[in-house]
UniProtKB/Swiss-Prot annotation:
This is Protoheme IX farnesyltransferase. Belongs to the UbiA prenyltransferase family. Protoheme IX farnesyltransferase subfamily. One of its GO terms (molecular function) is protoheme IX farnesyltransferase activity. It comes from Vibrio vulnificus (strain CMCP6). HAMAP family: CyoE_CtaB. One of its GO terms (cellular component) is plasma membrane. The gene is cyoE. It catalyses: heme b + (2E,6E)-farnesyl diphosphate + H2O = Fe(II)-heme o + diphosphate. One of its GO terms (biological process) is heme O biosynthetic process.
Length: 299
């Protein structure tokens, strides 16, 4: 009787839910927030809500496509890692061919949306970001060098620039300031996770920094990047993009981030690395929310 009533949850899962998971929606949501900040800080001479909405949809579709390609390319190593073995492809919830079609479909829709209704610069920059993450990072850098996250970090740091160009159609140094914040944030964010999952990465021969250079070296690198990040986060104030609300928020958040890095380096407990990884997500979320609110209050 119990066997009859027992149903595998994967059998109850809808195909739409599976494809939704492939897009890494939480990651995409954070990317869209940083895109909105880029839009908000850009000059608004040619701003329309219609264009902004299409831009966000196009960026989201192409980011989801990059995530799906990542699932497809990494499916074999995902099946061997404790953090990822429950993903749709290792579980057999969807076929690799269907994931390929899905990634191509939403990526194409996103690119066409940006090209036809936003501007070509944003379309090509978003496509370059997709290639940087799905091909350059996932196919090559991830397996080739412990500096994989550092080199490929530019791809994940692009959304604020994409938001900016979707409104203005041109590049601007202020947009690159936002890119720089995410670029410097990326290594300590992922290295904290890599420390926590060191054995997993070693098992599948992924040369993350803790695997190739040791945990202590990685902790030192995280601390140095945390200090550098605190300095870079002051740039929006120094160049006139933000004022006191952002300054106060950035100071508080960076003090907390550096304290986590110091604790990880000198007084680490078993869960310190994963706690820092989780805090780093809230750090970026709150930092960009503060920047957005600061800008809105200044209007």
């Amino acid at each position: 009787m119990s066997k009859t009533l027992s149903v595998d949850k994967s059998q109850l899962r809808s195909p739409w839910s599976t494809y939704w998971t492939l897009t890494k929606p939480k990651v995409v949501a954070l990317m869209l927030l940083t895109s909105v900040v880029g839009m908000s800080l850009a000059p608004h001479e040619h701003f329309t809500w219609h264009q902004a909405l299409i831009a966000l949809v196009g960026i989201a579709l192409m980011a989801g496509s990059a995530a799906a390609f990542n699932h497809l390319i990494d499916r074999r190593i995902d099946a061997k890692m404790a953090r990822t073995y429950r993903r749709p492809l290792p579980k057999g919830d969807v076929s690799p061919f269907n994931v390929l079609l899905f990634a191509l479909l939403i990526g194409s829709l996103g690119f066409l949306s940006l090209m036809l209704w936003v501007n070509s610069l944003t379309a090509y920059l978003t496509f370059a970001s997709l290639l940087g993450y799905a091909a350059v990072y996932t196919l090559y850098l991830k397996r080739a060098t412990p500096q994989n996250i550092v080199i490929a970090g530019i791809a994940g740091a692009m959304p604020p620039l994409l938001g900016w160009t979707s409104i203005t159609g041109e590049l601007h140094p202020h947009a690159w300031v936002l890119v720089m914040i995410i670029f410097i944030w990326t290594p300590p964010h992922f290295w904290a996770l890599a420390i926590h999952r060191k054995e997993d990465y070693a098992k599948v021969n992924i040369p993350m920094l803790p695997v190739t250079h040791g945990v202590e070296y990685t902790k030192t690198s995280i601390l140095l990047y945390a200090i550098l990040l605190a300095l870079v986060c002051m740039l929006p104030v120094l160049v006139g993009m933000a004022s006191y609300l952002y300054l106060f928020s950035a100071l508080v958040l960076n003090v907390c981030f550096v304290r986590y890095a110091i604790k990880l380096k000198f007084r680490a407990e078993e869960r310190t690395a994963i706690e820092m990884f989780r805090f780093s997500i809230y750090f970026l979320l709150l930092l960009f929310c503060a920047l957005l609110l600061d800008q809105q209050l200044a209007l």
